[in-house]
Amino acid sequence: MGISRDSRHKRSATGAKRAQFRKKRKFELGRQPANTKIGAKRIHSVRTRGGNKKYRALRIETGNFSWASEGISKKTRIAGVVYHPSNNELVRTNTLTKAAIVQIDATPFRQWFEAHYGQTLGKKKNVKEEETVAKSKNAERKWAARAASAKIESSVESQFSAGRLYACISSRPGQSGRCDGYILEGEELAFYLRRLTAKK
């Protein structure tokens, strides 16, 4: 029996079983879930209706994640799934889907922040090795102008100290073959942090 996306097999609103007046059709087909896992990139192409293609990511380990408040995006490594709104089983098996909350490597974002604002992020304040490197006057002027906007919220800064950021996947790895998303901030981050602590 193939997977079908029709609704003719469902009971009616009154609970009556519908009569089968036709067989399954090709345009109603469904496919098995991709169940994308974290690992070395493995992507299969699937021929779909109209000769189009879908890209089924079976294994993927990196993605482009955007930092909305700073207006940048960086390619970074995905560490693991920590929360899923629909199913705890997907957390246990580290399955990547849209809307999954994952932890990503903070290094590319930390390096960008330090280059852009000239301030260390997620490190102890008493470390002084970097101050020996001479910076140009032009760089100093740029950093001085940007200093006012170099504030980030404390809950995000504490994640930089740990080297892992919470992010939400916004692409569909089983359809597009990509695992892209955005870093959680503000009320959304607070909501998911509450969910994570409640789960423990």
Curated annotation (Swiss-Prot):
Coiled coil: none annotated. The modification Phosphoserine is found at residues 66, 69, 73, 86, 154-155, 158, 161. Residues 1-31 are annotated as: Disordered. The keyword Thylakoid does not apply. Disulfide bonds: none annotated. One of its GO terms (molecular function) is structural constituent of ribosome. It comes from the Eukaryota. Its main location: cytoplasm. Transmembrane segments: none annotated. The modification Phosphothreonine is found at residues 62, 107. Keywords: Cytoplasm, Phosphoprotein, Ribonucleoprotein, Ribosomal protein. GO terms for biological process: maturation of SSU-rRNA from tricistronic rRNA transcript (SSU-rRNA, 5.8S rRNA, LSU-rRNA); translation. Signal peptide: none annotated. It is found in: Cytoplasm. InterPro entries: Ribosomal_eS8, Ribosomal_eS8_CS, Ribosomal_protein_eS8_euk, Ribosomal_Se8/biogenesis_NSA2. GO terms for cellular component: 90S preribosome; cytosol; cytosolic small ribosomal subunit. Present with 15900 molecules/cell in log phase SD medium. There are 2 genes for eS8 in yeast. Component of the ribosome, a large ribonucleoprotein complex responsible for the synthesis of proteins in the cell. The small ribosomal subunit (SSU) binds messenger RNAs (mRNAs) and translates the encoded message by selecting cognate aminoacyl-transfer RNA (tRNA) molecules. The large subunit (LSU) contains the ribosomal catalytic site termed the peptidyl transferase center (PTC), which catalyzes the formation of peptide bonds, thereby polymerizing the amino acids delivered by tRNAs into a polypeptide chain. Component of the small ribosomal subunit (SSU). Mature yeast ribosomes consist of a small (40S) and a large (60S) subunit. The 40S small subunit contains 1 molecule of ribosomal RNA (18S rRNA) and 33 different proteins (encoded by 57 genes). The large 60S subunit contains 3 rRNA molecules (25S, 5.8S and 5S rRNA) and 46 different proteins (encoded by 81 genes). Belongs to the eukaryotic ribosomal protein eS8 family. This is Small ribosomal subunit protein eS8A. It comes from Saccharomyces cerevisiae (strain ATCC 204508 / S288c).
